[in-house]
Amino acid sequence: MQVSDVEIRPYPYPYRAMLAICSDLDRTPDRFCYERIMRFCNTTAPTPMGDGVALEVGNSIYFSMPPDQFAYWNTDSTGRAMVRALIRSGHIDTLHSFGDWARTRTEAGAALDELSRHDCMLAVWVDHATAPTNF
């Protein structure tokens, strides 16, 4: 074999393609539903939607939303602990804006302070809406 016969594969052997999937929490009503979605996507455990599909699927989180939508500030301490654990494990990897009810830089700062206080980091920001905190 000559050096010219060697090439870098675009994907690690034996794979020929890649796919990234991220769930989006829009309209998720509460921590129970959020957890069921994550369990269905990431495990083989039985869920109300059927047996889990065992994919590695990330998700997003808001901080401040109306009471009928799951967000960090409007869930209970168990829900907030779940969010922090999912951030640390990499299953929540996206800040889906600070939320529709976060209206000031002070509120955005409080969310960032909360992440920092719990040693949680989200490197991805996404917002396909018109959140007031799109400064």
Regions found by a protein language model. Name each.
Residues M1-F135:
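Catalytic alpha-helical scaffold of carbohydrate-active enzymes acting on polysaccharides/glycoconjugates
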